[in-house]
Amino acid sequence: MASETVANHQEKALALLQADAEKILRLIKVQMDHLTMPQCPLYEEVLDTQMFGLSREVDFAVRLGLIAEEQGKAMLGELERELSALHEAFTNKQQ
């Protein structure tokens, strides 16, 4: 019973983190769809705040043993790759 509860908590933690990551990904995709300036201070502020918050959530979940560190790193890495693609797309549009 205890191991079932732990597994349930782990699944919930991962689902919540993935939902938060999806929100950030949608923000990045909206920006990419409109290809507005990614250096916009408001956009950068919101994205930085969201990424920092998610990284703290991931760290907390890892420290509690709810997710593996590799899972958290993979989640954050995917978002960072999407952000990099946004900057590249904007740079290519400018040329």
Curated annotation (Swiss-Prot):
Family indicated by similarity = Belongs to the UPF0358 family.
Under the heading Gene3D superfamilies, the entry gives: SO2669-like
InterPro entries from the UniProt entry: UPF0358, UPF0358_sf
What is this protein's record name? UPF0358 protein BC_3949
Q: Can you tell which superkingdom this protein's organism belongs to?
A: Bacteria
Which spans of this chain does the record mark as coiled coil?
Answer: none
